[in-house]
């Protein structure tokens, strides 16, 4: 079995739980997810099966869309609703214009510091391991892309009796929505946290494309594999090059290819090679031999 499943991860499960259960449902060990979702978050989680596991990094690199509920006036240890409250402040009136001004400032390339309760590694240990031991460590900042921030709940002012608002976030990989909630609060002059989160899109998969674990289980029992998308779905945004029989045979053996073959796509950092409509391999310019391209991943098996 090879392909990509757009899974709807339900609240209360870890991403690893989903992989474990799918291995049992699909009767295959080669299962990998494409970016962790916290247990209390539900949403789109593309799962790579079989040879598609070689594409996981490309699927992960694609943009994401989230719908978050952000609460002003309270901050927590984890930056979400699961943590202990560490700061509070009564809200004065915050106009929709003031909020929009902050959202505009945080659109584009921004710098984030990952939360202490996260899986980012420092000196070989995950940050949440330090946090659980009560140890604060210096966290590396990272630049992330925020493509758009759109308020979804109308234009009401925020105040003590109405401290929450809904926000749709379109962003690049590595963005912490919890941290974004805190940053919005800081610019407004208030403690804040992310009180709810749902991922409505991951790469090329939307909420309406998804299947739950129970739906996949039922479909498997009925020998219905319509939950499985072809490998080519994972490289939709990648530049493609059609190859012939002769080149195909070389690619299956992991051969270096002449740069002249890639003249139409020479400005690309990687190219998907397609033979008879199927993804065969992903190639990139050779770092030392400037007249050659080399395989980054050979996807199709050489069964000769």
From Swiss-Prot:
It is an enzyme of class 5 (isomerase). Gene3D superfamilies: Pseudouridine synthase. It catalyses: uridine(55) in tRNA = pseudouridine(55) in tRNA. The keyword Isomerase applies. The active site is at residue 38. One of its GO terms (biological process) is tRNA pseudouridine synthesis. One of its GO terms (molecular function) is RNA binding. It holds the Pfam family TruB_N. Its EC number is 5.4.99.25. SUPFAM superfamilies: Pseudouridine synthase (SSF55120). Keywords: Isomerase, tRNA processing. Responsible for synthesis of pseudouridine from uracil-55 in the psi GC loop of transfer RNAs. Belongs to the pseudouridine synthase TruB family. Type 1 subfamily. This is tRNA pseudouridine synthase B. It comes from Listeria welshimeri serovar 6b (strain ATCC 35897 / DSM 20650 / CCUG 15529 / CIP 8149 / NCTC 11857 / SLCC 5334 / V8).
